[in-house]
């Protein structure tokens, strides 16, 4: 009988995270990005006869910390293997990786999924393994973005030998949105740890998607296809959604899905066939004879575990439960470690959490974006933001004045209290100082006063505006409304 259960996608991600060490994984060659091609190459990177690789200790530390943050079981012993393949970007004709004895296995990551027009939900996505390996070089194809159609190709070995960790998820992901959110949470995690900048545009974080479809959760897995060339989280989501639809259409029209590697074409919003997918046997793995096995003591693991920072998922929970933020605001604030730390320090200095969140996510982020800066560039002290928020709460200044002075506070990193005093921006709060100004307004606009008394009470807003204009916004609007209403009705 034909299975008519709804189609279900089965998705797994292989995420390559470039570690931000100063030197490469097995040599002292620099990892600096953006320098002249082939200036960070040495005999070890090229695999010249007589050279021996030596593991960078910081790479091991960063890899173990990432494993622990992703709830993986770190092995007591692991080893490196040679993955053999011939391609111009690999000067040794093999890549040093880990095959059957990886650094860590069997972990998970809890991800918050915000699907369009659906309630946000939490999903625990399993992680199969994490292993260390070296990156390959970079090919630049002249006249095309890929080998096919290019006139010639240039190779830059600056990237070759840079340390990577590859994080392989279990096939627990079911939608493009889940895939995108999972990758995004991986990036948040490595940024919080400080082990990688996670910059997709520079290749510091790259994701390959393995995807198949089947009829319902009880059916066997279908033939999986690998998708490459996605350089943003939205591209991951769109590539998955396109490929799911493509595979379903093929099956429903009696076709066959082949195990292949496909490329995401951002311009055309579709996947293109690149090559048939190799199996692990095609790479002829064997233990690297130049690198001994690695042993990690329990004491060392415990030390690195204790050095882990509070991670984004825990911060989100804390911001909702302890600070009263909405799930959305807690997600925005915790998205970037610099922003989260700035927010917490602002609150620790006496600011209301909700007001601090609003000022940070709206006004400060808006200012930084307009000046093409990121949050890490912010020079403003959280002490001064807390001070400004409290000046508003104490009615020393209005929200409008605060918005006006914020750019200067950010540029100069100075006390808002001092700036308000120097510029005479403090609110006029005593009635005796405001009433003479109101008297002048009544004398200045006799027609409007007469119209108000005839019943056109909406003119009260006009008088409030004029009062604000004369005082440069330094009167509390509620007090202005009260005093004007009393005077006009007398």
Swiss-Prot record:
E.C. numbers: 6.3.5.-
Keyword field: ATP-binding, Ligase, Nucleotide-binding, Protein biosynthesis
Pfam families: GatB_N, GatB_Yqey
GO molecular function terms noted in the UniProt entry: asparaginyl-tRNA synthase (glutamine-hydrolyzing) activity; ATP binding; glutaminyl-tRNA synthase (glutamine-hydrolyzing) activity
Catalytic class of the enzyme: ligase
Biological processes annotated in GO: glutaminyl-tRNAGln biosynthesis via transamidation; translation
Catalytic activity: L-glutamyl-tRNA(Gln) + L-glutamine + ATP + H2O = L-glutaminyl-tRNA(Gln) + L-glutamate + ADP + phosphate + H(+); L-aspartyl-tRNA(Asn) + L-glutamine + ATP + H2O = L-asparaginyl-tRNA(Asn) + L-glutamate + ADP + phosphate + 2 H(+)
Assembly, per entry: Heterotrimer of A, B and C subunits.
Homology family: Belongs to the GatB/GatE family. GatB subfamily.
Function of the molecule: Allows the formation of correctly charged Asn-tRNA(Asn) or Gln-tRNA(Gln) through the transamidation of misacylated Asp-tRNA(Asn) or Glu-tRNA(Gln) in organisms which lack either or both of asparaginyl-tRNA or glutaminyl-tRNA synthetases. The reaction takes place in the presence of glutamine and ATP through an activated phospho-Asp-tRNA(Asn) or phospho-Glu-tRNA(Gln).
Protein name: Aspartyl/glutamyl-tRNA(Asn/Gln) amidotransferase subunit B
Organism: Prochlorococcus marinus (strain MIT 9515)
